[in-house]
Amino acid sequence: MNIFADFSDRIINAVKALELKPKEGGELDLSRVAVEPPRDPSHGDIATNAAMVLSKAVGENPRALGERLAAALAEDPDVAEASVAGPGFVNLRLGNGFWHARLGEMLLLAGDYGRSKMGNGHKVNVEYVSANPTGPMHVGHCRGAVVGDALSNLLAFAGYDVTREYYINDAGAQIDVLGRSVLMRYREALGEDIGQIPEGLYPGDYLKPVGKALADEYGTKLLERPAEEALKIAKDTAIDAMMAMIREDLAALNVHHDVFFSERSLHAGNGGTIRSAINDLTLKGHVYKGKLPPPKGQVLEDWEDREQTLFRSTDVGDDIDRPLIKSDGTFTYFAADVAYMKDKYSRGFEHLIYVLGADHGGYVKRLEALARAISEGKLHLTVLLCQLVKLFRNGEPVRMSKRAGEFVTLRDVIDEVGRDAVRFMMLYRKSDAPLDFDFAKVTEQSKDNPVFYVQYASARCHSVFRQASEQLNVRKFDREAMKAALHRLDDPGEIALIRKLAEYPRLIESAAQALEPHRLAFYLYELANQFHVQWNRGSETDRLRFVKVNDPELTHARLGLVQAVCDVVRSGLALVGADAPEEMR
């Protein structure tokens, strides 16, 4: 249960019970009433601005109205204290019984605690990674992969019908370059001295196995084929090999996709799919023949000093109109984007989310304009831009390139620090802020390493249960027995920990609404910190120990609290895409 949504209903009902009468010409706008945690926890558990936002409409002093509202809310059996602070904020402190009941619900729901129906099954498409199939994934791809995957997990947990998609850029000039690069490696595999790879081709050694595979399959016969046919074979083989490599990299990072969509499929049949999409835009009045003015102070993709077929994107929010068909009759890159978005819309998605690198910032307005044009304003589109990741080791910058044609790959990073560290740390900053990734920091066992600190909380929870099992000679602890004893929890630290656990459903919904999966990582660190603090208090003060052999009922109550922490940490880490270990190794 989202306790803040619950108390929002209670506060609105209390406001209605006051029978406030708006002044002539005024109205009570209850949508402005906010219910949230107080900025200062010492002020209570729930805070509302209701008196402040409604006072003007009813012509009453906000503090006086706050006093009336506080008096009404004090009648609620779950409210231990209702007070007014500042100009009219109403703060509520909830009784221990309320928190015991919430903890009981957590134990009942277990791994489903925090799951929401907020999304109501709305269809969302999240496109992320979509790295060109021209080589292995490098660390620059990593952040978008983690953000997109964790966001998809979060949205699904919040009740949305999520499709995770990868757009394979397997058409265009970079694929021709890939094919020519592989043909060089093919000749090398046949024993030819190819010398230095020419500038403009891909020089990486990762293409050598592809060249060898062609040599093994075709021998010298590929040299006898027409150049265009040989290039097509090389391109097809290379794309398959690169995508297999990329899929392996994604699997190593625990990143998943439901759909891999090929750009080449849009160009099949003489580009019939693209032509159909452009025709649809034409019928809606969004396409015309014309000549764009020369760009001022910038390089404009696909600009020609000739008449082209153009998308009238300035009518739907873009800065400039966009070329669709060049003067020679060939499609622009953007033309394929038109067909691809139309395909997504035809699949019934209500919200399209693109997770892109910061260098794609120029795409935002054109994609938003395209969504408006295709759907006539019905399609919701969001672009999340991920800023750069900088690598460090003990505070010293790490070179992103290892040697000519080679770079620090995603697999290099995973092999050194582990998948969980990579995933958690990629979410430990908001995606639009630059991220510093220090190999030494993410492997140290200290509070300063967030992923260790959170996973250590999971391991400690399990160690408490192992200790309790040994000392009480109980093989397995029953959740109902733990739930029945929760009334014994009265230490302020215990109540504070329950309060933190009770924030989880609200955190899920707010993070999903804001499309900000980094909030999960922040919350997990805060929860882990409170748990470690309570564990340390027990190690220093005997009466606060989780396991009290001479008081089985209190032990069951405290184990219920530990179980809830364990459940939420496991749930949150699963959404992040990391494991919740039972032991630290």
From Swiss-Prot:
UniProt KW Ligase keyword: yes
Residue positions of motif 'HIGH' region: 131-141
GO cellular component: cytoplasm
InterPro entries to which the protein is assigned, alphabetical: aa-tRNA-synth_I_CS (IPR001412), Arg-tRNA-ligase (IPR001278), Arg-tRNA-synth_N (IPR005148), Arg-tRNA-synth_N_sf (IPR036695), ArgRS_core (IPR035684), DALR_anticod-bd (IPR008909), Rossmann-like_a/b/a_fold (IPR014729), tRNAsynth_Ia_anticodon-bd (IPR009080)
Keyword Heme in record: no
Reaction(s) the record says it catalyses: tRNA(Arg) + L-arginine + ATP = L-arginyl-tRNA(Arg) + AMP + diphosphate
Entry EC no(s): 6.1.1.19
Gene Ontology BP annotations: arginyl-tRNA aminoacylation
Entry keywords, A to Z: Aminoacyl-tRNA synthetase, ATP-binding, Cytoplasm, Ligase, Nucleotide-binding, Protein biosynthesis
Xref: CDD domains: ArgRS_core
HAMAP family documented for this protein: Arg_tRNA_synth
Family membership: Belongs to the class-I aminoacyl-tRNA synthetase family.
UniProt-recorded name of the protein: Arginine--tRNA ligase
Source organism: Chelativorans sp. (strain BNC1)
